[in-house]
Amino acid sequence: MQFAYFTYFIFLLVLGGILYYGRDWKGYWSVMTYSAIGYGLGYVIAMFFPVQSPWFSMAGMWHGELVGGPLTALVNLIEKCGRVHGAAFPSQHVAGAVAALWGAWRHRRRLFWVFLPFVLCMCVSTVYVRNHYVADVIGGMVTGTLGYVIGVWLMRKQEAVAARA
């Protein structure tokens, strides 16, 4: 499940890479815009709703650390040494993955169907590995979707993509 949680950044990298190397500049910059807006909205919301993750707020209720392979051990170490208090809502991992998922829907429909089960698994794993509450995941889905909707609106403006790589 830790691996599923860690996959949030892969979706944007894969989709962005395919669009970039396919020289689909409008698609590439659109997807980057969806993600940037989704992340930006999420950070603003987190400032107004500083929610601690279950990792801290429910720490006494667990029956021990999560058990798994080397990735789980690495994550447990990171959690102990560098975890941020008060930035659980909305889940930025989910927001970024959902924004990329919407980008795949709009620009590479087949990739959307490849991403979908992995994004759903990542959403479940965010709760399972104690990083977020279900409300954080729903908030991340809404934030990522808003990033997409606002990004589509912005990219429809003439000359929204003037850069060429």
Task: Describe the residue ranges of each PLM region.
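Membrane-interfacial alpha-helical segments at the cytosolic side of multi-pass membrane proteins
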Residues: 14-21, 94-112, 142-151
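Membrane-interfacial catalytic/cofactor-binding modules of polytopic membrane enzymes
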Residues: 44-107
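Divalent metal-coordination and catalytic microenvironments
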Residues: 9, 31, 50, 93, ...
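Aromatic-anchored segments of alpha-helical transmembrane domains
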Residues: 39-46, 119-128
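Interfacial helix-loop-helix junctions of multi-pass membrane proteins
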Residues: 53-54, 88, 121-147
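Interfacial segments of alpha-helical transmembrane regions
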Residues: 13-49, 57
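N-terminal transmembrane-helix/juxtamembrane module of multi-pass inner/ER membrane proteins
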Residues: 1-11
